[in-house]
Amino acid sequence: MIRILVLMITFTLMTGSALCSIEQLMRVFGGGSVGGGSRLDINRRVTIVPPEGELSFGYGFRPGFY
């Protein structure tokens, strides 16, 4: 029972730190605010667009000419 409890606490801490890292990456791409509209061009062909609203999930990939 104690092993399961220790495993759950460890998993919770690892997941929380991962989610915090994802939030920091979104702030970098979003220009310091959640749901920002900045874009990152990769080879000028693919544009990575962070979610615009607070209820959006994931990133949208679309050609750079949009």
From Swiss-Prot:
An example GO biological process term is: mating plug formation
Tell me the compartments it is located in: Secreted
Question: Which Gene Ontology terms of cellular component type are present?
Answer: extracellular region; extracellular space
Expression by tissue? Specifically expressed in the ejaculatory bulb and seminal fluid.
Which keywords fit this entry according to its UniProt record? Behavior, Secreted, Signal
Q: Which residues form the signal peptide?
A: 1-20
What the protein does comes down to:
Protein component of the posterior mating plug.
This protein is called Ejaculatory bulb-specific protein 2
